[in-house]
Amino acid sequence: MRLVSRRRLKGLALVAFALIGITIFVRILMEFQLEREVSFYKKFFRLKKDGLHGVYNPIDIKQIPKQTIDDLYRAKMETVSASKPIDWSKYAYVNYVTEPNYLCNTLIMFHALIKKFGTKAKLELLISNELFKSEIQSRNEQVQRILKKIRELDSEQIVIKEVQNIVKPTDQSPWNESLTKLLVFGLTEYERIIYLDNDAILQDKMDELFFLPNDITFAAPLTYWFMSEKDLEKTYKEVQHDKMSINLNKYTKQLSNRIRNGKEIYNHLPALPQSLYLNSDRVAKEILDSTSSASPLFDADSLKKVGKVKFASNLMVIKPSQETYDYIINDCLPRIVNKKEKYDMDLINEELYNLRHVVSRQVTLFRKLRSAFKPSILVLPFGTYGILTGSIRKPQEHMIMRNDILGYKNIDDEGNEIQKSIEEVVLNNKYIHFSDFPLGKPWAYSSFDQLKCRVDPASSKDVAADQKNCDVWNSIYESYFTQRMVCSKDDSPKASEIQAA
C-alpha cells in the first residue's frame, strides 16, 4: 500500500509540474503574441493616425495640454447662439464639507466663482448632516450663518444638499471622512461636474473643463510631487525612443488645426510615458498581469500596485454615472472602508482608475472589436489645474511644474525651451491646493503673520532665490486671508472665526 501511495504521489507531482509547465508555456506564448501586437499598434497609430476616424489607440493614456482645452472651449463657444444656448444647469462645480472649519472655504470659492469670475454653472455643496447636530449652540449658529451667506450669493445657482458621512470607523486621522467625496460620482442630474476640494485657492473659473471630448468620463491632474527631476529626464528619453517628438508645440499646433477643422483629436494627444505608471518596460506582461484572470503564479501581489504617478483627487472632472456610483458604493467601499491608510485617492487609483488596469481594459476591448474601445479618461495639466503650495518652496519641483505635460517640453519656434519663472507658473494656475506639511491649513492660524514664510540667511544656499519663492508663497496665503473676510459677521477680517465657534 505504501508503494502504491508513493507512486500516486509521484504521479500527482508529475501532473502538477506538467500543468505548471503548460501554464508557463502558454503565458510566455501569450506575452510574446501580445508584445508583437503592442509594437504593431505603436507603429500603426504613429504612422496612420491622421486618416483614422472612430478608431483609437488603446495602449496609451493621453494627456491634454492647456492650449488644446482652451481651443475646444473656444470652438464650443463659437457654436453658441441665441437659438442654441448652453444649458448651464447641466454643469456644476461641487464641494463637500464634513467639518465646520471647512465651510467658510466653500463660501470663498463660490463667492469667487459667481462674483469675480462670472460662471453660469451650478454650484453644489454636499454638506454632512452631522454639522446640524452639534450640542454646541454657537457652532450650529455659525454653520447656519455661513450657509445663509452661501445661499444669498444666488439662490437659483446654488444647490445645497445634506448627505450622510462615509466614515472609516476605526480611523482617527484627519482623512477618516474623505471617502464622502465619492458621493459626487452619483450626481447624475448633471452632464458633467468639476469636483474641487475646498482647502485650496481659486484664481479663475474652469468652465472650459465642462467641454472636454464627450466620451471622456473622468479627467484629473497627476500627483507630480512623487516625481524627481531624474524621473522627468527619463520620460523625455522614453518619448524619443518611441520615435516621437518631445516638442509640445508641435502637438498643440496640429491639435489646434484639427479642432478648427472639426476633426477628432484623441490619437494626436501626447501620450503619458509608460514608465510613470507601469512597473516594467514589458508592456504585454503588465497588461496580462492586470487582467482579472491573471494566474497567481505571475506576481499577483502587483495587481493593485500603482506607478510613480497617479490621479490626484482634489480636482476631478466627472461624468456622473449610476453604474459607476453603484460600483463604488456596493463593491469598492466595502473593500476599503476598514483598511488602514486607505482613503479616497487610494480607491480612485486602485479600484476605479488604476492606469495599468485602464490600459489592459482598453487593449482587451480593442482586440475584441476595434470600434468597441472609446477613450474615457484623460490626464489634465497640473500646471493649470493643480499645484501644491508646498511645491513653491521646493526648487527641485519647479522644472516639473514648468513642463506639466510629462515627457514633453515647451519649446518655441526657434527650438529653445521656454523658461517659466515660479511667478509665472503660479500666476497661470487656476487651482492651488494648500499642502505644506508640517504646517497646518491657513484657517488654523489667527493671522497671516503666524505662518509667513521667512528666509534664514544662515541656512539658505541662495538667499535671493529663496526669498523670491517665499514672496510668491506668501502672496497666495495673503490672498486667502483677504478673501476670508467674506465669512466674518460684520465683513471685517476674522480669520479664525470658524475655529472659535
UniProtKB/Swiss-Prot annotation:
<keyword id="KW-0333">Golgi apparatus</keyword>
<feature type="topological domain" description="Lumenal">
    <location>
        <begin position="33"/>
        <end position="501"/>
    </location>
</feature>
<keyword id="KW-0472">Membrane</keyword>
<protein>
    <recommendedName>
        <fullName>Glucose N-acetyltransferase 1</fullName>
        <ecNumber>2.4.1.-</ecNumber>
    </recommendedName>
</protein>
<dbReference type="InterPro" id="IPR029044">
    <property type="entry name" value="Nucleotide-diphossugar_trans"/>
</dbReference>
<feature type="topological domain" description="Cytoplasmic">
    <location>
        <begin position="1"/>
        <end position="11"/>
    </location>
</feature>
<keyword id="KW-1133">Transmembrane helix</keyword>
<dbReference type="GO" id="GO:0008375">
    <property type="term" value="F:acetylglucosaminyltransferase activity"/>
</dbReference>
<keyword id="KW-0325">Glycoprotein</keyword>
<feature type="glycosylation site" description="N-linked (GlcNAc...) asparagine">
    <location>
        <position position="176"/>
    </location>
</feature>
<dbReference type="GO" id="GO:0006487">
    <property type="term" value="P:protein N-linked glycosylation"/>
</dbReference>
<dbReference type="Pfam" id="PF01501">
    <property type="entry name" value="Glyco_transf_8"/>
</dbReference>
<keyword id="KW-0926">Vacuole</keyword>
<comment type="function">
    <text>N-acetylglucosaminyltransferase involved in the Golgi-specific modification of N-linked glycans.</text>
</comment>
<dbReference type="GO" id="GO:0005797">
    <property type="term" value="C:Golgi medial cisterna"/>
</dbReference>
<keyword id="KW-0808">Transferase</keyword>
<feature type="transmembrane region" description="Helical; Signal-anchor for type II membrane protein">
    <location>
        <begin position="12"/>
        <end position="32"/>
    </location>
</feature>
<dbReference type="InterPro" id="IPR050587">
    <property type="entry name" value="GNT1/Glycosyltrans_8"/>
</dbReference>
<keyword id="KW-0812">Transmembrane</keyword>
<dbReference type="InterPro" id="IPR002495">
    <property type="entry name" value="Glyco_trans_8"/>
</dbReference>
<feature type="short sequence motif" description="DXD">
    <location>
        <begin position="197"/>
        <end position="199"/>
    </location>
</feature>
<dbReference type="GO" id="GO:0005774">
    <property type="term" value="C:vacuolar membrane"/>
</dbReference>
<keyword id="KW-0735">Signal-anchor</keyword>
<comment type="similarity">
    <text>Belongs to the GNT1 family.</text>
</comment>
<dbReference type="GO" id="GO:0000139">
    <property type="term" value="C:Golgi membrane"/>
</dbReference>
